[in-house]
């Protein structure tokens, strides 16, 4: 009898099992706590609404600028499209040039000796520091904006590709060579698959850096873009628009990050689950 009761209790526990993982639950709980604290502080007006509007006001403003009224002569969707175009073009260029450069540096000490000092010299410099050079050399058009974001993404991608090549076990390369594989076959079937986890991690890091550079890039005589919208709203003390723009940037960046994680799990299942 007691065995039957225990089995029933166990089946009920399984039936009512919480569907989300512990990590996801904690993340949602953290966001809920932050929103509650924000709402409480804003409602009690512990901070002036001019500097910290309540969440519902930010949501209302977000819906307003997403409509025909927009902000700064453009709707939210037009600002979003402009920013996504810039960052995707910069990311594509960084992948197109950064990965081959990183692989070449990993395979050739000569190439690494030539390019490594250049990358390491400019990599620690914040984008705002060479922003004036971009304007002087390339003007105030789209080229300077995209190039600024590209430079921010290029270094993490190239260095991750370099680290990926160096992480490939030499015994696998020698085994392929002993089986008669050509240099191109070793590169395509041994080195690239071995370096792929590091390369994809570099893309994730580079994309995060690219989003942080977006605001700086859109300071260059931009008329549309999320960074431009946030910067312009700050000049007019439109804090609700600033917070709405930051929220949109965070959500889009997070969705792209989830997409890259899914891609990494699919392309490199042997590397373990990406958390």
Curated annotation (Swiss-Prot):
Subcellular location: Cell inner membrane
Keywords: Cell inner membrane, Cell membrane, Membrane, Transmembrane, Transmembrane helix, Transport
Gene name tied to this protein: tauC
Keyword flag Cell inner membrane: yes
Name the UniProt record assigns to this protein: Taurine transport system permease protein TauC
Membrane topology summary: Multi-pass membrane protein
Pfam family, one: BPD_transp_1
Gene3D superfamilies: MetI-like
NCBIfam families membership: PRK10160.1 (NF007545)
Family to which the UniProt record says this protein belongs: Belongs to the binding-protein-dependent transport system permease family. CysTW subfamily.
UniProt main location, coarse: membrane
UniProt-listed CDD domains: TM_PBP2
